[in-house]
Swiss-Prot record:
The active site is at D160. Pfam families: Methyltransf_4 (PF02390). This is tRNA (guanine-N(7)-)-methyltransferase. It catalyses: guanosine(46) in tRNA + S-adenosyl-L-methionine = N(7)-methylguanosine(46) in tRNA + S-adenosyl-L-homocysteine. GO terms for cellular component: nucleus; tRNA (m7G46) methyltransferase complex. Belongs to the class I-like SAM-binding methyltransferase superfamily. TrmB family. Pathway: tRNA modification; N(7)-methylguanine-tRNA biosynthesis. It is found in: Nucleus. Signal peptide: none annotated. Keywords: Methyltransferase, Nucleus, RNA-binding, S-adenosyl-L-methionine, Transferase, tRNA processing, tRNA-binding. It is an enzyme of class 2 (transferase). S-adenosyl-L-methionine binds at G79, E102, I103, N137, A138, L157, S235, E236, E237.
């Protein structure tokens, strides 16, 4: 029987077109195009965040359902973007808990949904239970989440360069914040920085070398680190730089 115009319209209205589904029918993962947001966010703006008064108040079990008694987050990917490198950390270090910290709401929503989808897809193995994403402003609230000497590694990959001189104070690496990072890093802990902007790289190196609690790894030490090869294109931003044949500027620092 041929559908009349009214019947065809009803059928069309009752159908949910796949194009409106934010989850891919093929991979089961969220589709990035439904979570697009401007590339950067003003970290000084008065965003509305719920944050704990102290690290002991953080409900880590809500983010890591399989967390063990006494287990703590060891790695922090600050400004994790769409979570590509965070996922890599979860795969490389299955016994460690890694957190991605992202200020942009849609982007952090994407990472949360991505992690949830990966957990569902790997329910039989329990993979990706060791990664999570938190929407927050790391420039303001880092000590609210981590206790003294808790973190083993921190990552600052392709941060906002804030090109204008008046906005340099917004850069994620500056003297005041370096002291906070030193507080939450254990002695011997590592800070990984990567950018495709040479001016920002020089800024990072200068500020970290001037700080008394950090020393830069030698080129040999950096190249021997198994994480180093992953820094170039595990993140979405890094992969874009590779596609565009851009430059990468790497510097890794040890907490003294």
């Amino acid at each position: 029987m041929v559908a009349t115009g009214g019947q065809a319209q009803d059928q069309s209205q009752n159908q949910e077109p796949d194009v409106l589904n934010p989850t891919s029918a093929v991979t089961g993962l969220p589709q990035k195009r439904y979570y697009r947001q401007r590339a950067h966010s003003n970290p000084i703006a008065d965003h509305s965040f719920d944050y704990p008064a102290r690290p002991e108040d953080v409900d880590w079990r809500s983010m890591y359902p399989s967390i063990q008694q006494g287990q703590q987050v060891s790695f922090a990917d600050v400004g994790c973007g769409y979570g590509g490198f965070l996922v890599t950390l979860g795969e490389m270090f299955p016994e460690k808990l890694s957190i991605g910290m992202e200020i942009r709401v849609k982007v952090s929503d994407y990472v949360v949904d991505r992690v949830a989808a990966l957990r569902r897809r790997c329910a039989d193995t329990g993979a990706y239970q060791n990664i999570a994403c938190l929407r927050t402003n790391a420039m303001k609230y880092l000590p609210n989440y981590f206790s003294k000497g808790q973190l083993e590694k921190m990552f600052f990959l392709y941060p906002d360069p804030h090109f204008k001189r008046a906005k340099h104070k917004w850069r994620i690496i500056n003297q005041a914040l370096l002291s906070e990072y030193a507080y939450v890093l254990r002695k011997g802990g590592l800070v990984y920085t990567m950018t495709d902007v040479e001016d920002l790289h020089k800024w990072i190196v200068t500020h970290m070398e001037e700080h008394p609690l950090y020393e830069r790894l030698t080129e040999e030490e950096a190249n021997a680190d198994p994480i180093t090869p992953k820094l170039y294109q595990s993140s979405e931003e890094g992969a874009k730089v590779v596609r565009n044949k851009g430059d990468h500027f790497l510097a890794i620092f040890r907490r003294l």
